[in-house]
Amino acid sequence: MYNSILHTLQSQQGAIIKATEQHISISLLSLLIAMLIAIPLAILLKDHHKIAEACLQVAGIIQTIPSLAILGLLIPIVGIGTVPAVIALVLYAIMPIFQNTYAGLTEIAPNLEEAATAFGLTKWKKLQRLELPLAMPMILSGIRISLVMIIGTATLAALIGGGGLGTFILTGIQSNNNTYVIIGAILSAILAFFFSWLLKFISTNTRRMRIGLIAILVMVCGFGGYKGYQAIRPAPTKVVIAGKMGSEPDILIHMYKDLIQQEDLRAEVTLKPNFAG
């Protein structure tokens, strides 16, 4: 088994790197979107407890829906590929970030709030100088939980053509190849452990937290945004479709060609009919 894993890592090095990049890009893009939704929403609702509780209930209900069911519901609406995978991951990631941000902002000691008001700080200045710095450890904890969950769940993107490390797991299951399953699972676990450790490391020190937050934002916005956009809007590719001998396979490959060219007029589709087998 050990030799088989080493051989696969060497022979499939390019595919593994590509799948890892896809996995990270999908995860970071999903995290970025979830943060842009959850953190501002928690800030807006920190003084509206009933609405915030209702939002938490809705987010909790979404968390109980199986991921495969969400993907199945999204396919008829947005099709297959990266888009439904990102939407599903965002839905799962919102609750921990929103819950922790809201808790961090609402559990600040009242005497500190009163002191800030007595100094004449506006709501924005109070948020900027008092509330967000005090709530930041809780916010980072929510982001860490969401990111680990996203990285683990992103393996399901392979089921709908979204790419990522799940392609190795899926290929291994279909071909009864335990080596592929182990490689996909171990790499996913390593990514989850690394990003969890990174966020925990920067949250233990104020200076480290500031530098780390800037680095994470740059990484998420740059790598996640650019790679995620590439995954959602891939460059035109050449497609080769092979079919067995006979009239029915010949009809099928021509149908596939028409369907592909309807979706992407620039796609170059090459047909290879009359394959034996």
Role assignments for model-derived ranges:
Residues A15-I26, I75-P96:
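Loop-to-helix entry region at the N-terminal start of transmembrane alpha-helices
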Residues N100-I139:
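Short cytoplasmic-facing helical segments at TM-TM junctions of multi-pass membrane proteins
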Residues L165-F201:
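Hydrophobic alpha-helical transmembrane segments of polytopic membrane proteins
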Residues M1-L29:
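Periplasmic/extracellular loop-to-transmembrane helix junction in inner-membrane transport proteins
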Residues L41-L74, Q99-A103, E107:
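Cytoplasmic-entry segments and transmembrane alpha-helices of multi-pass inner-membrane transporters
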Residues A235-E248, Y256, L265-L271:
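Short, well-ordered beta-strand elements
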Residues L91, W124-L156:
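Transmembrane alpha-helices
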Residues R208-Q230:
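Internal/C-terminal transmembrane anchor helices
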